[in-house]
Amino acid sequence: MNDDIKTVTVYPTTLELTTPTKSANGSNDDYDPHQHRELKNPTTNFQTFAHFLKASVGTGVLAMPSAFAHAGYVNGTLLTLIIGSLALYCLHILIKCMYILCKRQRVPYVSFSQAMNLGLKQGPPWLRCLAPIAVPFVDGFLAFYHFGICCVYVVFIAESIKQLVDEYLVVWDVRIHMCIIIVPLLLIYSIKNLKLLAPFSSAANLLLLVGFGIILYYIFEELPPLSERDPFVAAGKLPTFFGTVLFALEAVGVILAIEENMATPKSFVGPCGILNSGMSIVLGLYVLLGFFGYWKYGNESEGSITLNIPQSEIPAQVVKVFFAITTWISYALQGYVTAHILWDKYLAKRFKETRQTFYELIFRAIIVLLTFGCAVAIPDLSVFLSLVGSFCLSILGLIFPVLLQICVQYTEGYGPFRIKLIINLLLLCFGIFGGVVGTYVSILDIIAVYK
C-alpha cells in the first residue's frame, strides 16, 4: 500500500487500511475476514437465499421468450447456459479476489470499488495508473445501473396497473398511474436494511412461483409443432439476445450487498452454497420460460410474455397483479444498492450522526422521485433494457472481475504456461466484444423505435 493512503471508507463501517501485517510464519493465512465482520442486522442463509432469487428473477425473465426469438431455441438454450455459467464464474472470481484482498489487508471487508482500487495497485505496472479512478468509476457504474433498473421497474408497475384499470374502470395515461404508485414506492424504499426486506423477498418469491405456474399453463395449452420454430437465427440478432439475457441474469450489486450482509458468508460461495444453488434455479427457470415461451409464441413473443397471454381472462390478470407486487418489492432491493453506495460512502459523513436517519429518508425519497421523473420523461424506457445489459453489465459482471483477478494474481503468478492469464484474457475479450456489439445493436434498435 502507498503511504499516502491512510483510510478507506467501507460501507457500512470504516476500516483502517495499513500495510498488511503478517503472522509469525510470514503469511496472512491465519486471518479469516469472515470471522471479523461485525454487522448490525445480519441475514440468515434462508433470508439471503430469498434475496438472491428475488434479485436474480426480475422483469428480465419475462423477456426471455422474446430473447429466444433473437437466437432460436437451440442457440437460445445453449447461449443462455453459457452466458449464465460465465456470469456465475465471474461472480465467483470477484468474491474470491475480494476475500484475498481482505486477507492481505487484514480487514473484514472491502467493497467492489475498493477491491478494484487495491487490485490495480498490486497488478501489472501499466494498469496501476487506473487505481485512482477505480473507486468513483465502479461506484458510479453500480449506482447508475441499479438506478436504471428502478426506472424500468416504475414503468413496468405502472403499465401492469394500467392494463387492469383500463379493463375494468377508466382509461388513463400511463403517467397518471406512475403518479399513483409514488407513495407505495416511497414506503417500500424507506426500509433501509436487508433483514427487514427479507420477508418481502420471501413473499415475492411465492407470488413469482404462482405467476410462473399460470404463465406455463397458458404456454402448454395447445403448443404448436416445434418444427414451426427456428433452432437458429441470423447472427446479427444475437447481440440483442446477449444484452437481454445478461440484463436478466446479472444483479452484481445486489448479490455483493447480500453477501456482505450475511451472518455466515462462507455459506455463500461453497460448492453447494447459495450462489451456485440459486444460479442453478435461476438458469433453469430462464431456459424453461425462454424455450417454451418461444415454442408457443414464436416471433410474436412480446417484450414481456404477460402481453402474449389472454388479456381479458382472470388468471392472466392475476399474473399481472402478482408481477406488479413482486416488482414493487424488487424496486427496494435493486434501489438498495444505489442508496447504499451514494449515502453510506459519500453523503452520510456530511451530516451529524443524530440527523442521519432523517436525511437518509429524504435522500431515498429524492431517488424515488428521480426514477419517477425519468420514467415519466421516457415511458418507453423498456427499450433501453438491452442497452443497459450490454453496456453496464458487460463491464460490471464480466470485464471488471476478470481484470481484478489478473491484478490479484500478478504477484503470485498465473500458473504453468500462464494458463490463468490466458483464460482471463479470453474472458476479457468476450466481455469487451459482447459489450461493444450489444451496445451498438441496442442503440440502433432505440433509434428505430424513435424514428
UniProtKB/Swiss-Prot annotation:
Matches recorded under Pfam families: Aa_trans
Main location: membrane
Cytoplasmic side: 1-48, 102-136, 189-199, 259-272, 342-357, 404-420
InterPro entries named among the record's database cross-references: AA_transpt_TM
Localization in the cell: Cell membrane; Late endosome membrane; Lysosome membrane; Basal cell membrane
Extracellular topological domain residue ranges: 70-80, 158-167, 221-237, 294-320, 379-382, 442-451
The organism's place on the tree of life at top rank: Eukaryota
GO-annotated molecular function: amino acid transmembrane transporter activity; L-amino acid transmembrane transporter activity
Membrane-spanning residues: 49-69, 81-101, 137-157, 168-188, 200-220, 238-258, 273-293, 321-341, 358-378, 383-403, 421-441
Disruption phenotype: Viable. Adult flies show delayed recovery of the midgut epithelial wall following the cytoplasmic purge response to intestinal bacterial infection. RNAi-mediated ubiquitous knockdown or tissue specific knockdown in enterocytes or epithelial progenitor cells impairs recovery of intestinal wall thickness after the cytoplasmic purge response to intestinal bacterial infection. RNAi-mediated tissue specific knockdown in Malpighian tubules, visceral muscles, enteroendocrine cells or the fat body has no effect on recovery from intestinal bacterial infection.
Induction (record text): In the midgut by intestinal bacterial infection; probably in response to the cytoplasmic purge response to infection by enterocytes.
Keywords tagged on the record: Amino-acid transport, Cell membrane, Endosome, Glycoprotein, Growth regulation, Lysosome, Membrane, Transmembrane, Transmembrane helix, Transport
One of the GO biological process terms: amino acid transmembrane transport
Miscellaneous remark of the record: 'Arcus' Is the Roman goddess, homologous to the Greek Iris, who personifies the rainbow and replenishes rain clouds.
Homology family: Belongs to the amino acid/polyamine transporter 2 family.
PANTHER family the UniProt entry points to: AMINO ACID TRANSPORTER, AMINO ACID TRANSPORTER TRANSMEMBRANE DOMAIN-CONTAINING PROTEIN-RELATED
Name of the featured protein: Proton-coupled amino acid transporter-like protein acs
Name of the gene this protein is made from: acs
